[in-house]
Amino acid sequence: IPKVVEYKKASSFFEGDEEYEENIIPNIIPIWDHSPRSRGKSLVLNHAEPSYFARHMKEAIKRIENKPLDHRLAFVKSWNEWAEGNYLEPDLHYGKRYLEVIKKNVVEG
């Protein structure tokens, strides 16, 4: 049986003050469902939505914005890990909304 955690609740644990340090790179997680690969001992982030991803992204940007330019990095996990329910590619449920969050917060800033 997978462990199911609400994304909104879990996302507070994604961020830490250490991410303000110059050599620490934040990781932004859009969606997570490891149950197809884990057979029982898995984690599912329930109700992962673009609006929560946007909030998580804004927090990561806040943590890197005052770092030297060559340390202003954040990782987004992951482009197309469909087997782990961890992806940004457009889908039938949210369309391009995850990509639009990135465009709004990073490209248009």
Question: What is each residue range found by the language model?
Answer:
Residues I1-S51:
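Aromatic-lined glycan-binding groove of carbohydrate-active enzymes
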Residues V4-V5, V44, V76, E81, ...:
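Extended aliphatic helical segments
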Residues G85-G109:
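Aromatic-rich peripheral "rim/lid" segments of glycoside hydrolase catalytic domains that contact
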Residues F13-N23, R63-D70, N105-G109:
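A structural motif corresponding to the C-terminal end of an alpha-helix
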Residues E49-H93:
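Substrate-binding cleft of secreted/luminal carbohydrate-active enzymes
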Residues K8-S11, M57-I61, L99, K103:
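Generic structural signal for well-ordered alpha-helices
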